[in-house]
């Protein structure tokens, strides 16, 4: 994965790529973090090893992008390696790319809201479809309740289709396969 590809991805896709392909999942997590009281010389050697380890990772760019969006790194203390970058490097990159990162974070949040709306509608549609109208009041009353339920189901399905179609169009799917 390239940096350009990673920059275009939303947070859940970056996270999934990292979860599926990161080399560090089998490594000792302590390699990537400075221990309390660790000497600068020892940390520099460990940091160099961690950075080298990251450079062989197929999802390094995704990890770096997520680290930038998450605000990892500290301008006062170099205490971690993520995405093949030291904490200081992440801070510097974040400052250089502040405008792009702000836009990416905003898009992530909008995507999260859209996803939440999509899942909320799907859950509500499922609930409504499983609901059994009351049997009290006789057949005419039950028929009216069923008609209302069917109208509500059609309304929810239409709302769900609008959100799903917009989401697919925005992400380049246009038509589902």
Q: Each predicted region: which residue ranges?
A:
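Compositionally biased, low-complexity repeat tracts
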Residues: 58, 79-80, 168
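Immediate flanking context of iron-sulfur cluster ligation sites
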Residues: 11-58, 64, 68-75, 87
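Polybasic, low-complexity association/targeting segments
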Residues: 1-14
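Short flanking/linker segments adjacent to small metal-binding domains or redox-active Cys/His motifs
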Residues: 93-174
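Polybasic, low-complexity binding patches
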Residues: 45-48, 65-122
């Amino acid at each position: 994965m390239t940096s350009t590809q990673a920059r275009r991805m939303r947070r859940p896709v970056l996270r999934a790529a990292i979860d599926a392909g990161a080399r560090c999942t089998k490594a000792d997590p302590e390699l990537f973090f400075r221990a309390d009281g660790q000497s600068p010389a020892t940390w520099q050697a460990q940091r160099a090893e961690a950075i080298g380890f990251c450079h062989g990772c197929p999802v390094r760019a995704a990890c770096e992008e997520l680290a930038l969006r998450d605000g990892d790194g500290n301008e006062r203390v170099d205490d971690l390696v993520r995405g093949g970058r030291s904490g200081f490097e992440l801070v510097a990159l974040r400052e250089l790319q502040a405008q792009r990162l702000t836009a990416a974070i905003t898009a992530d949040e909008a995507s999260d809201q859209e996803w939440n709306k999509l899942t909320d509608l799907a859950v509500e549609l499922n609930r409504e479809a499983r609901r059994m109208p009351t049997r009290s009041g006789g057949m005419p009353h039950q028929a009216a309740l069923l008609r209302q339920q069917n109208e509500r189901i059609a309304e929810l399905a239409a709302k769900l289709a609008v959100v799903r179609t917009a989401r697919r169009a925005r992400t380049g799917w246009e038509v589902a396969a």
